[in-house]
């Protein structure tokens, strides 16, 4: 069923009172995060526990870039806080269309963790990748695994119609279509890059430590005979032994020794390789192919 609602606040109040899982869709700067916060404020004010899942791996508001993050909210005052994520899932890229499988699994796993932690409303703030094969594939599989009963599509014109049509053909879901939030400022590419760099800078805040690592601790597994220097400056997800991401790290190779620089080394059991190199001076990133890093092809 398709519903057109003119008031963002009206819909936020309705979802806060009735919904259990809501997925927000929209292109850049359409107000997904703003609406997510409206819903969370209204729901927590009514005594509900909200699991906010931020699946925007480029400019995340929960956790660092390259990760899907989740926070459990019980009070309206928590909604706008800059606070550590209660759970992270490392994806390892800034472009969700490059690693669709990892993106979908990361989002679905944190939706499940939010429910297990006691959330009676989960709000999924998705990426701005909404068009073409990549956008539709990403959203189709997120719908398939997360199973929201309400979807909100924010649009400036009619750009969301193809993806809305696809979701309604394949899923029994109520879709609400709203115009883009009028108060949302359009950010320039430079502003987005600055926000991304600041998020990575926070992820590598002091106290940082170097931990010597063995070639056997990685996923995917390193090929035999790999020149470890090829891993220098690669971004990694630091994982415990329970399938949970503790935070980010950066590999450093010097004098034949491989180390990881991180502030979450306690409890570290394994490292997941990302598809980015990180410059710690500027916190700018450069995409890389793991196939090329490992096999030179």
Give short role names for the model-derived ranges.
Residues 1-17, 24, 42, 149-297:
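Preference for solvent-exposed, low-hydrophobicity sequence contexts
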Residues 2-25, 46-47, 51-122, 130:
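Nucleotide-state-sensitive switch-loop elements of NTP-binding domains
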Residues 28:
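The conserved Walker
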Residues 32:
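Conserved lysine of the Walker
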Residues 35, 39:
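Hydrophobic positions on the alpha1 helix immediately C-terminal to the Walker A/P-loop
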Residues 41, 57-61, 140-142:
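A generic local secondary-structure boundary/capping motif
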Residues 113-173:
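Phosphate/Mg2+-binding loops and adjacent switch elements
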């Amino acid at each position: 069923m398709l519903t057109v609602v003119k008031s963002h606040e009206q819909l936020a109040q309705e979802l806060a009172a009735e919904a259990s899982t809501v997925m927000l869709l929209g292109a850049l700067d359409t107000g997904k995060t703003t609406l997510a916060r409206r819903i969370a404020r209204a729901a927590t004010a009514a005594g509900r526990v909200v699991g906010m899942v931020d699946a925007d791996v480029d400019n995340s508001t929960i956790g660092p870039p390259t990760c899907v993050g989740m926070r459990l909210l019980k009070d309206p005052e928590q909604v706008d806080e800059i606070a550590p994520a209660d759970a992270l899932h490392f994806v390892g890229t800034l472009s969700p269309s490059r690693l669709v499988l990892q993106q979908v699994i990361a989002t679905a796993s944190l939706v499940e963790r939010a429910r297990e932690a006691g959330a009676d409303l989960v709000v999924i703030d998705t990426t701005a990748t909404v068009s073409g094969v990549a956008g539709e594939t990403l959203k189709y599989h997120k719908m398939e695994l997360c199973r929201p009963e309400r979807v909100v599509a924010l649009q400036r014109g009619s750009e969301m119609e193809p993806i809305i049509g696809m979701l309604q053909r394949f899923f029994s879901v109520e879709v609400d279509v709203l115009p883009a939030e009028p108060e949302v400022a359009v950010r320039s590419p430079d502003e987005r890059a600055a926000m991304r760099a600041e998020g990575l800078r926070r992820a590598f805040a002091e106290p940082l430590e170097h931990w010597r690592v063995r070639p056997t601790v990685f996923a995917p597994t390193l090929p035999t005979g790999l020149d470890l220097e090829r891993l220098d400056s690669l971004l990694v997800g630091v994982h415990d032994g329970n399938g949970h991401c503790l935070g980010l790290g950066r590999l450093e190779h010097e004098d034949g020794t491989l180390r990881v620089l991180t502030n979450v080394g306690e409890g570290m059991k394994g490292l997941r390789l990302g598809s980015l190199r990180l410059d710690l001076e500027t916190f700018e990133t450069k995409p890389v192919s793991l196939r090329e890093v490992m096999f030179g092809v």
